[in-house]
Regions:
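A generic "binding-loop/recognition-motif" signal
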Residues: 26, 80, 123-124
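Conserved acetyl-CoA-binding loop-helix of GNAT-fold acetyltransferases
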Residues: 89, 95-108, 119-120
């Protein structure tokens, strides 16, 4: 992590970028940010009601002028595992380290919550590999935990477990995991 301390992500960096917790009023911005990726079938679309219901999981990256330029969420699955999801940037801000800063903030949140491992389902294998994520195959949870998780209605949990019912949504994606 390049910043230090609990409030490190609540200040603008040298490029004027601020990563902060999302507000309910950010939902239209999240929809705007994910729309190009949904159109290209890189991300699944989300209804506004789902975004409002999970807004506390999201972080927003603001550009120097205060406009939201990135979003990402951290969803906890179990006592030791969470998923980075809905990580998206305004395409003008790709390759300008905003994604790195967003991921660092979400990993910071995971550590604050006591989570030991972070999962992601991604087409951006190189990006996540640079941050220490490794490709995974079979289940990385015990049979008892699997039996609990398989009852979840959360699509992200189903993707983590690699369940057949979500296979059409995950074709071409790589399942990756990082130990914090």
């Amino acid at each position: 992590m390049t910043e230090h301390g609990k409030h490190a992500f609540h200040v603008r960096d040298d490029h004027g970028i601020l990563v902060r917790p999302a507000l309910a009023s950010d939902v239209p911005h999240i929809q705007r940010l994910i729309a190009p990726y949904v159109d290209r079938r890189i991300l699944l679309g989300k209804e506004n009601v789902a975004l409002y219901g999970s807004i506390q999981q999201f972080r927003i990256a603001e550009g120097p002028d205060g406009t939201p330029i990135g979003c990402g969420a951290l969803a906890v699955f179990w006592d030791d595992i969470a998923e980075v999801r809905t990580l998206a940037l305004d395409e003008q801000w790709i390759h300008k380290r905003v994604g790195h800063r967003m991921l660092e903030a979400l990993e910071h949140d995971a550590r604050e919550l006591g989570v030991a491992r972070i999962f992601c389902l991604t087409f951006e294998v190189d990006f996540f590999a640079k941050h220490g994520y490794l490709e995974i195959g079979e289940s990385v949870v015990s049979p008892d935990v699997y039996a609990e998780l398989v009852r979840s209605s959360d699509e992200g949990v189903a993707e983590f477990l690699d369940l057949a019912r979500v296979k059409p949504n995950t074709l071409g994606n790589t399942r990756m995991l990082k130990n914090l």
